[in-house]
């Protein structure tokens, strides 16, 4: 044993220029001494001194064969002679020594028993110093193989260290036992090295197994070192698969990353921004956006600016389908407290985008877009084009919800101006959304030719079947009364459309057939539509959408039967629709029309008012109430006129309301006014689509 060396060893230790015994020098897994890197070894010892030390070790009678090889192999490794080191290490038969190593480790962990001075430790018991020396030799052998590119063999050698120590310490590394520091250091380096070797060898399964093995027992890893291992395992689980990552792997990675983030929050480990990035990716992959928002809220102040925090949280809530919460967070950036802060560009752009999707928040969207445009020339043309696009959409939505005619006209002009500005700024690389939104806004404002040009341009630029584009084109063609062309486009589109898209197209086709006075064809189309809806597999995400489609299909079929005068069949269809969606304003309006056809005026009024109780601004129901009032006598004409004026305030282009307003004026003896109302109804009907443009 080296610890029982004779004077030969002391003579080696006393040599000039060698302040430490070679047998007791600490060695890191990178092949460097505890004091200096491998590159400093030659500066510490002259070549002649290394040769002399090597010769001395070979002649030292106190070292056994394996220990001498361990020391000689270490010297060769430190000098960069990996082939030579490997040859030396191969002479150590670790399989023969394993039982003695395990026994030595086990005996070291046993509680000390009182013994007489006459008791002598058996000479066959290996000291912990020798155990560490031999295990270090295996580690260096693995390192040598790694340097020579033999990664699989290196991993198998490294695994020996783990097998030996785990057999001796099945419950993990004990605390407070003297003489274990060197052993623990070597073992922990082997724990960290093994998965890296398997990774280099291309064995994904063994890499994961090695990381899990390192985390399965308490090996006294310091918190930061343990965190690095946990992070490495999480990254391999997330990104290591060649194909799609298995669900179990993602879940395990999420648990590991959550633990690490919690440790960061309480200060157990250093802050690592990459952990939040990886957790964001993992939770996004599994759709757990609200959980991600919760972890973002736990991050310490200063990690993100307030703008960044609101932006990230709003992304989470929006992805989770909680747009209202997302918009409320984004609106904080518009408050007076943020006026002195540097504007967060992505936040403003995302705020404008979210608000453009919801007409209720169109005013907030206008504010977001204006804040972005106020930054002026400091932004790219693309960004300014996006800001103008969302501004135009928000102006259009605001116009449709405006109660004042003057304001509505002003907002409509602003909408077209902003969308045209977006198109002009992106002229070099036209954006499809800009062209589409501009076409829709032109259609809503009954600029039918401009809308048609935009719809055709959009469809041609898509370069394939775009259900959204072709559907819009069909509706625009219906506004030009080119109903056959519109139906042909739908037939063409349905050949390539998916099932959900085909449902929307079939519904529009049925409406087109009704407009062409083809009720039997429309009935057949509605039947096909219902069959397609029922054939769909329902999931949590699609169930509500399919239920909405089926409700509308039954209501459409009721309208078809109503056109044919088959009111009992129409009522049956409406009962089916009500069983799926009781609180449907259109359903109650159609029910009222059926009752009105049977001259049940009071019951019809009840149905119409039920519709308005669900949606107070439901224009068809308001017009229906006015029509019933008109039949109740001349004394009800002012009330009917009031309802019709309210309908036109909500929808100024409703030709049906203008027509009935003409009837009211005619009954009141206002012939000139009636003629003007009829003229307005006629002109609006010429450009009226069979289905809303929005």
From Swiss-Prot:
<feature type="repeat" description="TPR 8">
    <location>
        <begin position="620"/>
        <end position="654"/>
    </location>
</feature>
<dbReference type="Pfam" id="PF13432">
    <property type="entry name" value="TPR_16"/>
</dbReference>
<protein>
    <recommendedName>
        <fullName>Protein NPGR1</fullName>
    </recommendedName>
</protein>
<comment type="subunit">
    <text>Interacts with calmodulin in a calcium-dependent manner.</text>
</comment>
<dbReference type="GO" id="GO:0005886">
    <property type="term" value="C:plasma membrane"/>
</dbReference>
<feature type="repeat" description="TPR 3">
    <location>
        <begin position="135"/>
        <end position="168"/>
    </location>
</feature>
<dbReference type="InterPro" id="IPR019734">
    <property type="entry name" value="TPR_rpt"/>
</dbReference>
<keyword id="KW-0112">Calmodulin-binding</keyword>
<feature type="region of interest" description="Disordered">
    <location>
        <begin position="12"/>
        <end position="40"/>
    </location>
</feature>
<feature type="repeat" description="TPR 2">
    <location>
        <begin position="66"/>
        <end position="101"/>
    </location>
</feature>
<dbReference type="InterPro" id="IPR011990">
    <property type="entry name" value="TPR-like_helical_dom_sf"/>
</dbReference>
<keyword id="KW-0802">TPR repeat</keyword>
<feature type="repeat" description="TPR 1">
    <location>
        <begin position="32"/>
        <end position="65"/>
    </location>
</feature>
<feature type="repeat" description="TPR 9">
    <location>
        <begin position="655"/>
        <end position="688"/>
    </location>
</feature>
<dbReference type="GO" id="GO:0005516">
    <property type="term" value="F:calmodulin binding"/>
</dbReference>
<dbReference type="InterPro" id="IPR043376">
    <property type="entry name" value="NPG1-like"/>
</dbReference>
<keyword id="KW-0677">Repeat</keyword>
<feature type="repeat" description="TPR 6">
    <location>
        <begin position="551"/>
        <end position="584"/>
    </location>
</feature>
<feature type="repeat" description="TPR 4">
    <location>
        <begin position="188"/>
        <end position="221"/>
    </location>
</feature>
<dbReference type="GO" id="GO:0031234">
    <property type="term" value="C:extrinsic component of cytoplasmic side of plasma membrane"/>
</dbReference>
<feature type="repeat" description="TPR 7">
    <location>
        <begin position="585"/>
        <end position="618"/>
    </location>
</feature>
<feature type="repeat" description="TPR 5">
    <location>
        <begin position="307"/>
        <end position="340"/>
    </location>
</feature>
